């Protein structure tokens, strides 16, 4: 039996299939990132000008305090998605820097201390990723599986950012 015609047909098919899977996955990652960006902006809309400027000492409205606490959860979710491979390298670089900066600004920093106390008492999330990110701006959540870890370190995944 001559395998050449079959090989000629299967190799391009396998390559085309691989490219299609990669493109679909990349599109799905972008869709997930877009959803989280929209959630971020909807929370930002609930902040007063004083909060956006990082001023402390003003009385937070209940809606504003809730939005800040939801921001913490959103940020933890983003880090979780990163560990599952659903956030790209470039996007995580942007998000992690912004999250770290925001967590050090008032009134976020003050509410973060309260949130940690609640977490220690079992009344809130554990926030394992945010705790690390707060102290290490370059923190990148470890991949949740062996294959994801290998893929994240793969040589063809070159950074397009700085």
Labelled PLM ranges:
Residues 1-65:
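Membrane-proximal alpha-helical anchors
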Residues 63-68, 72-162:
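An amphipathic alpha-helical interaction surface
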């Amino acid at each position: 039996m001559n395998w050449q015609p079959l090989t000629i047909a299967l190799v391009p098919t396998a390559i085309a299939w691989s490219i299609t899977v990669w493109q679909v996955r990349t599109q799905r990652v972008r869709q997930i990132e877009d959803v989280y960006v929209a959630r971020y902006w909807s929370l930002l809309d609930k902040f007063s000008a004083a909060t956006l400027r990082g001023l402390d000492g003003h009385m937070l409205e209940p809606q504003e305090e809730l939005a800040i606490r939801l921001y913490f959860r959103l940020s933890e979710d983003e880090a979780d998605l990163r560990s599952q491979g659903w956030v790209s390298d470039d996007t995580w670089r942007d998000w992690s820097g912004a999250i770290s900066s925001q967590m050090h600004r008032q009134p976020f920093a003050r509410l973060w201390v309260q949130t940690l106390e609640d977490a220690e008492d079992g009344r809130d999330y554990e926030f394992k990723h945010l705790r690390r990110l707060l102290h290490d701006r370059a923190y990148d959540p470890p991949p949740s599986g062996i294959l994801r870890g290998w893929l994240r370190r793969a040589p063809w995944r070159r950074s397009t950012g700085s």
